[in-house]
Amino acid sequence: MLEEVKGAQERANVPENSIETKAGDDRSMYVYVPASGCPDAKQTQVVMFLRDGADEASAQAAMKEYGLDALAEKEHFVLAFPNPRQSGWSERDAEDMDYLSRCFMALPQGKGKVGGFIGMIFYIGGSPSAGALLLAMSARRPLNVAGVLLSELPADYSIPQDGVNAPQVAYLCGGAARAADYFGKVNGVTGADARPLEHAVLYTSPVNPNVRHIVSELPFSAQEAVRAWDMLFCKARRWSNDTYGTYQKRTDFTARGFVAHVNDPGLGVNEGFAHTWYEYVPPRLRGSKEKAPLVFYFHGIGCVPLYGAEQSGWHDIADRENFIVVYPKPARNKAWNIWDEPGMPSDQAFVLALLEHMKRTYAIDESRVYISGFSMGGMMTNALACAYPELFAAAAPCNGFNSGYLVPASEMWTMLRKMPTGRGLPDGPSEPVTRTRVRADAKKAAFAYRMPLIQNSGLLDGTWPAAQDDPFKRLASFDYWKTYNNIPLTPYEPAAACESGLTADETFYDCADGRFLHHRWFSRDEGKPALFEVVLAKRMPHALDLRQLELAWQFMKRFSRGKDGSLHIDP
């Protein structure tokens, strides 16, 4: 189908899937949406094939010659054919690069009504000029290029010297093999990192095994397209969590043994609402009666559970550390009911019912149930931590703060209704004081609970140092958990040398590359345990770094919850 690509659109403001470009000319593209269907947009890959023609016949011919329609039907990706201008593709024309980004933005608004994930856009250069453009784009704008397949390069082409030298997944067919030295350089590989294949060599980065490129002796063909997909494209995802992103491996959920509950009314909660969640049990625990910890992970607004699984990698940590993971989906509109607003299904009741289901189904150590989440899922984590401290031993919210307690629903309602996920919301909240706050205050008044909490975020997510009037209440959230855990409040110093403006009992940089600014506060309780920590990633916007979850697990696993609500700490 022919789709318009408006030149005026410069930004797609979608949570965790935004892309920025520059305005340009109104152009068009042809799009093939597989009849077999696509997953949620944030789990959908997009393959863009650049050809020299600009008509439907040339798109159809390329699709059939290289078997791309059959591959799209099998693998459920969106196939796009951007149309070149009359002068053809030019690696010297920034408008062509901007236009390719606008093609991605145009997909959800088009006739196909299907989107993809910015970190899973793969490009195929079907001609020398297209290959030159894509090599220039991967060199200069790598964040928007998850992978490239180059079939040919112009005879007089010179590798860009003004690139940023970022790692890049790539497949080089015979006519583009002379770019091998460039990809070897940016991916940091040597001959020791090479593995011979039939008529090709696979190179794997010694720093990140998810960064790979293949140099093939063969010309581009349908068979080469399949090999590029099977060995590279289906395994690659570039998350926008650093200056030029980070490649992480994809998860084969079926092969890993995820247990899916899709639209399952069996929990008997929310008047029989059909809830969705996914369970993961490490192989060593399957069929075992040995009690194991349980981790809940709540994805961000506008996302889905399997996206959250790949984003967080909790199941990979579970394999090593022997715990069970559950990835729930909110009842409505991919947004968590963090306030427990009665005009909507109760996601908190859902989590409680799901916890009981997990205890009936598996051998769960009830004293070691932990919660974590990202963005609005981080808000959900905060809300559950204060509303149900008797059930959870520790919490690790990421990029979402205690808005469910600190921010009246009325303050966020207008914003939520404007978002794509806000369709069908009531006109406004039905109660002035949220049930989350009422429940949390009552629990704390009845017992001196402590809630160990490690808050993750990025130093490019919002403005740091944070303002006191921050609408998401970052500083107020920090002070809430300090007070909750009997930690003295410390002054906030926005002019301090520390990037965050936070003053803590301990401040240090984590990991060999100094990526994480780590703050730690100690309770005045006996033994002075560290019950509150904040970890901020340098160069990171609204995203996650897998190493933050590793730090979160090292923090949380030390804590367990007694039946009387008391907190126990391993030495």
Write out the residue ranges for each language-model feature.
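Acidic catalytic loop of the alpha/beta-hydrolase fold
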Residues: 176-177, 460-465, 541-543
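Structural cue for short, hydrophobic secondary-structure segments
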Residues: 47-52, 81, 297-300, 327, ...
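Active-site glycine-rich loops that stabilize anionic/oxyanionic intermediates
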Residues: 44, 51-56, 292, 299-304, ...
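Short beta-strand/loop motif that positions the catalytic acidic residue
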Residues: 171-173, 454-457
